[in-house]
Amino acid sequence: MALRVYNTLTGTKEDFVPIEPGKVKMYVCGVTVYDHCHIGHARANVVFDVIYRYLRSLGLEVNYVRNYTDIDDKIINRANREGVAYDAISERFIKEFDRDMAQLGLLLPTSQPKATEHIPEIITLVQTLIDKGFAYQMGGDVNFCVEKFDPYLKLSKRNLEDMQAGARIEVDERKRHPMDFVLWKEAKPGEPFWESPWGKGRPGWHIECSAMSMKYLGETFDIHGGGKDLVFPHHENEIAQSEAASGKPFVKYWLHNGFVNINSEKMSKSLGNFFTIKEVLDKYDSEVLRFFLLSAHYRSPLDFSDQNLTEAETGMERIYKALVAIDETLASNPATGGEEIDASSLGEAERELFDKSGSLPLRFREAMDDDFNTALAMGHIFDLVRCVNRVLSEAKERSNTLSALCAQVKANIGKIADVLGIFTSEPASLLTRLKDRKASELDISVEEIERLITERAAARKAKDFKRSDEIRDFLLGKNIVLLDSAQGTSWSVK
């Protein structure tokens, strides 16, 4: 099965065929760095990180560009409020964005250009649009004339006349048409500016991405990504100005991730219903957040809530507990795990595990080839984990065959982990990290829990079962669940 992607431009799933065989050029709109990033930003960046990883896993050479918008009205307004230079704001939030993305396990893109470092390219592009009759100067502003670009709105499938009739747009004497958009803004007193043929000013938002993407990827490239909220006006305007300037198709495949919702409303700063990445990571492990963001298909809406994050944490724990059990099995039989498995000698449950483990890479590939369906891919992992748990619970001894099966499962999950960017932690350490984080929210310390477990073990040894039960019940009242095994007593947070 060939990789198929949903192209917003055509509204259909299409076979993904790179313009240049073996190579992929991909641009994703980055953040405007004026404030803390929220979970909507996290989703977009994790989604395209996984797409980047998957394309590379197919043996493709990927040139991945993600920009920073480091000059904008919002940046200037914040700088004025704080009484600092605009670039003090942008640099502060670039560093914070980079830290957030590193915590979420993102790979670095090939290039991360800043708008302010590409002013000459932006000015050249604006001048080209003027020379070709697609843009006009009005005072110190330069605007794009949407009526001159016939395919305008082909991405969002809107109608220009309907939009003009239905919109409540204030008359702007600097525009010939209400939907014309700014390419170059005249600087107001006290604002940062750059010299240009049209006077002192700065670039508009849309032209920045066109100039940077075409510099690093060429006039036509394979993938342009971003959130659905960018389809109009940002990506629509990018298409108009880029294709008007070059006379060539701008992008072959347009990919857009769905919104993160709270109470059925899109999470956004403008609505005031957002949670920053830092706020969420103060409460949940970064791998839990990444797991949650990949638990739905990237184009589907994703409902954000404590309950859904807790459910994601529980699901991830289930997989990691199976990985710990696998590691313990391999540790108990260290000389085995690499030999061939004789399928004909396996029992029913072992044979099911053997088959599902062996087919996992193919099933994962089929899911990802279907428009990067991480939700289905993760479902296959859960299916395999159920088989692992059944086989290990029914096993009467840690045989060589069992170790070989465990080694196969671990290797195949590892291949998937590298693409999804999850299940990459050392399993026992990850579970300890999750447990300690949960315990920190309880009104009992980890040290006290461990002390009581030691006291309970002594009580059981002395056959003081009354005291043993008292300790167990006391801890259960604190949401601490004890699990007794031959290796001792472990605990978890309910």
Swiss-Prot record:
Gene Ontology molecular function, alphabetical: ATP binding; cysteine-tRNA ligase activity; zinc ion binding
Superkingdom of source: Bacteria
Enzyme Commission identifier(s): 6.1.1.16
Residue ranges the record marks as coiled coil: none
Residue ranges annotated as motif 'HIGH' region: 31-41
Pfam families xrefs: DALR_2, tRNA-synt_1e
InterPro entries, A to Z: Cys-tRNA-ligase (IPR015803), Cys-tRNA-synt_Ia_DALR (IPR015273), Cys-tRNA/MSH_ligase (IPR024909), Rossmann-like_a/b/a_fold (IPR014729), tRNA-synt_1_cat_dom (IPR032678), tRNAsynth_Ia_anticodon-bd (IPR009080)
Localization per record: Cytoplasm
Gene Ontology CC terms, in alphabetical order: cytosol
Enzyme class (EC, first level): ligase
Cofactor(s) needed by this chain: Zn(2+)
One GO process term, biological-process aspect: cysteinyl-tRNA aminoacylation
Keywords: Aminoacyl-tRNA synthetase, ATP-binding, Cytoplasm, Ligase, Metal-binding, Nucleotide-binding, Protein biosynthesis, Zinc
Binding site for ATP: K269
Chain ranges passing through the membrane: none
UniProt keyword Iron-sulfur present: no
Catalytic reaction(s) noted: tRNA(Cys) + L-cysteine + ATP = L-cysteinyl-tRNA(Cys) + AMP + diphosphate
Cofactor comment: Binds 1 zinc ion per subunit.
Family label: Belongs to the class-I aminoacyl-tRNA synthetase family.
Quaternary state and interactors: Monomer.
Name of the protein: Cysteine--tRNA ligase
Species of provenance: Geotalea uraniireducens (strain Rf4) (Geobacter uraniireducens)
